[in-house]
């Protein structure tokens, strides 16, 4: 995932439990290890995907295997990542098996979303504007099985959840004030959807 200035890229490595940072050499197009080349995660966390705050110096990594999100302070000049917080993506009472998949920050920079495969939900978090840390808003069922991916369309009005094992893409309206998701009733059949791209 490139940072908003397209200077650095963060690469989560699930197998090594680490987040690697590279700098883009614009003269050659090559990726070069950043000054702080990697940050270790907790053993067994399984970092999967990263997302940057659009305007503030924060990055968020969703950890697949322990169903958490790590909040980082991000140094846009050197590409450094400093861990600030780890928060679960699952409700306290949930005891089943679940892994995470996708993460996204709203275009407003006010909310973070993460998908849970097993709990089959989207976890919703509010971002503290002063510190970047997350607080849980709630969870919304994806109305399907195994939400491998989701995407927020460019205006930030709608979120689309791709349920891989129920062959559906479900549309939600994003409440701009609370970050909560409201099902629109629109469900599209699609064979094992695993990604959504807006062009």
Regions found by a protein language model. Give the residues of each.
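C-terminal hydrophobic structural anchor segments
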Residues: 123-173
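Beta-rich, blade/repeat-based domains predominating
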Residues: 1-8, 41-58, 89-109, 143-158, ...
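Beta-propeller fold detector
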Residues: 31-39, 81-89, 133-141, 181-189
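Short loop/turn segments immediately following beta-strands, especially the blade-tip
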Residues: 22-31, 72-80, 124-133, 173-180
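Blade-level signature of beta-propeller repeat domains, shared across WD40, Kelch, NHL, RCC1
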Residues: 164-173, 177, 182-199
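Conserved beta-strand positions in repeat-built beta-propeller and related beta-rich domains
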Residues: 3, 11-14, 53, 61-64, ...
């Amino acid at each position: 995932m490139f940072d908003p200035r397209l200077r650095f890229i963060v690469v989560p490595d699930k197998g090594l439990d680490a987040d690697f940072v590279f700098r883009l050499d614009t003269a050659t197009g090559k990726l070069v290890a950043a000054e702080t080349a990697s940050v270790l995660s907790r053993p067994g966390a399984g970092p999967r995907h990263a997302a940057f705050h659009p305007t503030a110096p924060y990055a968020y990594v969703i950890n697949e295997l322990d169903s958490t999100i790590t909040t980082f302070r991000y140094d846009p000049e050197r590409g450094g990542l400093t861990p600030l917080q780890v928060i679960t993506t699952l409700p306290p009472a949930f005891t089943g098996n679940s892994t995470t998949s996708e993460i996204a920050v709203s275009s407003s920079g006010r909310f973070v979303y993460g998908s849970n495969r097993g709990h089959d939900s989207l976890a919703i978090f509010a971002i503290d504007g002063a510190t970047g840390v997350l607080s849980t808003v709630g969870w919304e069922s994806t109305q399907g099985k195994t939400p491998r991916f989701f995407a927020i369309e460019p205006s930030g009005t709608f979120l689309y959840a791709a349920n891989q094992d129920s062959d559906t893409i479900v549309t939600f309206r994003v409440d701009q004030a609370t970050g909560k998701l409201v099902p629109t009733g629109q469900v599209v059949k699609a064979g094992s959807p695993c990604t959504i791209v807006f062009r």
